């Protein structure tokens, strides 16, 4: 693959500040221009162009067959592209396909000419061959073919880049039953349980947790920045309990446990339908002057998809179900929404489900329903009141064909809040990352991928603390978590909470060696 790309791009790279290194096309000004040009690049295309992977095989045939439907669907979703961009993408694809067919035909003819010349050389001595009109004609035709290919390869590379830089921004197709519009148009599918009743005004989770000294979020801007937090004692045990409760349930149901890297290349993010180069982005980018193209994952979905990237699985092993607990990092934009509390934070622990299925919507849709059923089972066993939403077109992002969210009731906030999400990405991710399965006959086909939240710890902590709070300030522990905490109630701590001794306080304590104030 790399050799083929180098051969074809050779005449083109010289004029673009590139040189060939070890079979790859390498930009000598890459590190110098990374910070300023990164947002204009497509790492997924570059990854393939440099020979590390095959080019994404987008389903352009379906798009070209029903362009009007694709254009309507494009306008109903959020994203950079609109229906007016579609004709240009299609025409570029068609031109590229015709050019590749022309190149393929010439390459086949070139091979045939080479074989014919070789046969003449074998059957005649050198002096006879040089005088043979057929030999001279074949040599002339060979030179003409090479000349044509030398002109066509750069054109192919230019069209290829033009196509992929736009086509890779196209979203997945949309399920016909998905509601149209923004999040306000979400369709309620199920409502489970009842709102907890209180004989007092319910408090918010942060007020509850600070009095129990199990969450600390104050005075951390100089320690770990805004939207960070500490969990202590029962707070930490609640996190471990939620993670272990979820992992145990899913492993018992046949899921394979995984751990994944927190640092991943941008190509994996883009293959999953995320944009590490967006401005602003929710993805933390590691300093490119030291570590070229490394990013902190905001979900284990990225690492799990990367595990299957450029690999095939056996058909008999489908569907594959993976589960992973990881720390997630998200650069939440400073919109002023939820500035305090655990609802929007920069780091949190989450258990993620990830599935790989065979082709066809039936199999991936069944797995999506299975994941949703497991989510509902987990929340039901935790005793939470929640509702299941069929998310509308503008909430699907790039990769989702269909997406279900679950919102749990949070009494202190006085409203529902999202706690889980489940998406069927069909073959959107697999076509970009080459996640495939091998049939019994040995044929490779693109798989479908499905992902779902198993347990997002901070938001479940909100729902649990606010739903199980008591008038005396204690919090009941749901039976499902009691084995992990060793108690049925979280009560006021027996220890003395930390006392702040830093600046900006009304009455400062006397430090060692400091004279008493008069």
Curated annotation (Swiss-Prot):
Query: What species was this sequence derived from?
Result: Bos taurus
Q: What is known of its domains?
A: Consists of two distinct domains, a catalytic core and a N-terminal extension that is involved in tRNA binding.
Share what the entry says about its subunit structure, partners included: Homodimer. The tRNA molecule probably binds across the dimer.
Does the keyword field hold Iron? no
What does the function comment of this entry state? Catalyzes the attachment of serine to tRNA(Ser). Is also probably able to aminoacylate tRNA(Sec) with serine, to form the misacylated tRNA L-seryl-tRNA(Sec), which will be further converted into selenocysteinyl-tRNA(Sec).
- Report the GO molecular function annotations: ATP binding; serine-tRNA ligase activity; tRNA binding
Q: Which residues carry this modification: N6-acetyllysine?
A: 110
Q: Which UniProt keywords apply?
A: Acetylation, Aminoacyl-tRNA synthetase, ATP-binding, Ligase, Mitochondrion, Nucleotide-binding, Protein biosynthesis, Transit peptide
Q: Which gene encodes it?
A: SARS2
Which residues does the annotation say bind ATP? Answer: 330-332, 345, 418-421
Protein localization: Mitochondrion matrix
Q: Name one Pfam family in it.
A: tRNA-synt_2b
Q: Extract the CDD domains matched here.
A: SerRS_core
Look up the domain of life of the source: Eukaryota
Pathway(s): Aminoacyl-tRNA biosynthesis; selenocysteinyl-tRNA(Sec) biosynthesis; L-seryl-tRNA(Sec) from L-serine and tRNA(Sec): step 1/1
- UniProt-annotated binding residues for L-serine: 299-301, 352, 453
Residue range of the transit peptide? 1-34
User: Which reaction does this enzyme catalyse, per its entry?
Assistant: tRNA(Ser) + L-serine + ATP = L-seryl-tRNA(Ser) + AMP + diphosphate + H(+); tRNA(Sec) + L-serine + ATP = L-seryl-tRNA(Sec) + AMP + diphosphate + H(+)
The cross-references to PANTHER family, in alphabetical order and at most eight, read: SERYL-TRNA SYNTHETASE
Q: What is the recorded post-translational modification?
A: Two N-termini starting at positions 35 and 37 have been identified by direct sequencing.
Name used for this protein in its record? Serine--tRNA ligase, mitochondrial
Q: Where is this region: Disordered?
A: 497-518
User: Which Gene Ontology cellular-component terms appear in the entry?
Assistant: cytosol; mitochondrial matrix; mitochondrion
What is this enzyme's EC? 6.1.1.11
The text of the family note is:
Belongs to the class-II aminoacyl-tRNA synthetase family. Type-1 seryl-tRNA synthetase subfamily.
């Amino acid at each position: 693959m790399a050799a083929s790309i180098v051969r074809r791009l050779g005449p083109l790279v010289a004029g673009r500040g590139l040189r060939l290194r070890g079979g790859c096309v390498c930009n000598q000004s890459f590190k110098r221009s990374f910070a300023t040009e990164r947002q204009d690049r497509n790492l997924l295309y570059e990854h393939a162009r440099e020979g590390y992977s095959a080019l994404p095989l987008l389903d352009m045939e379906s798009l070209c067959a029903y362009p009007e439907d694709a254009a309507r669907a494009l306008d109903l979703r959020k994203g950079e592209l609109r229906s007016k961009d579609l004709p240009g993408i299609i025409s570029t694809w068609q031109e590229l396909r015709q050019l590749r067919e022309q190149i393929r035909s010439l390459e086949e003819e070139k091979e045939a000419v080479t074989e014919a010349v070789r046969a003449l050389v074998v059957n005649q001595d050198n002096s006879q061959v040089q005088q043979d009109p057929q030999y001279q004609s074949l040599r002339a035709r060979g030179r003409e073919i090479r000349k044509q290919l030398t002109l066509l390869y750069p054109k192919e590379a230019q069209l290829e880049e033009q196509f992929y830089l736009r086509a890779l921004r196209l979203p997945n197709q949309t399920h016909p039953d998905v509601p149209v519009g923004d999040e306000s148009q979400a369709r309620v599918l199920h409502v489970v349980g009842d709102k907890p009743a209180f004989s007092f005004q319910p408090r918010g989770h942060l007020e509850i947790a600070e009095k129990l000294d199990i969450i600390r979020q104050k005075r951390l801007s100089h320690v770990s920045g805004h939207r960070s937090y500490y969990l202590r004692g029962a707070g930490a045990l609640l996190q471990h309990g939620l993670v272990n409760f979820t992992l145990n349930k899913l492993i018992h149901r046949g899921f394979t446990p995984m751990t994944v890297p927190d640092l991943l290349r941008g190509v994996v993010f883009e293959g999953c339908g995320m944009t590490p180069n967006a401005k602003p982005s929710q993805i933390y980018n590691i300093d490119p002057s030291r570590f070229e193209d490394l990013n902190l994952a905001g979900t284990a979905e990225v690492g799990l998809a990367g595990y299957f990237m450029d690999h095939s699985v056996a058909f008999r092993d489908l569907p594959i179900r993976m589960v992973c607990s990881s720390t997630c990092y998200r650069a939440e934009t400073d919109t002023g929404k939820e500035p305090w509390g655990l609802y929007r934070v920069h780091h949190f622990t989450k258990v993620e489900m990830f599935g790989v299925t065979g082709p066809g919507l039936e199999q991936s849709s069944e797995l999506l329903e299975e994941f949703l059923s497991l989510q509902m089972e987990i929340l039901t066993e935790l005793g939470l009141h929640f509702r299941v939403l069929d998310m509308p077109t503008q909430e699907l992002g790039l990769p989702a064909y269909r997406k279900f969210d679950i919102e749990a009731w949070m009494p202190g906030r006085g409203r529902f809040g999202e706690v889980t999400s489940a998406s069927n990405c069909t073959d959107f991710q697999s076509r970009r990352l080459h996640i495939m399965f091998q049939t019994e006959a040995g044929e490779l086909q693109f798989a479908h991928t499905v992902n779902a939240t198993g347990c997002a710890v901070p938001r479940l902590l909100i729902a649990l603390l606010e739903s199980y709070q008591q008038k005396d300030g204690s919090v009941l522990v749901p039976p499902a978590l009691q084995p992990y905490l060793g108690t049925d109630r979280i009560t006021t701590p027996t220890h003395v909470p930390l006392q702040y001794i830093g600046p900006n306080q009304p009455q400062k304590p006397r430090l060692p060696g400091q004279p008493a104030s008069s």
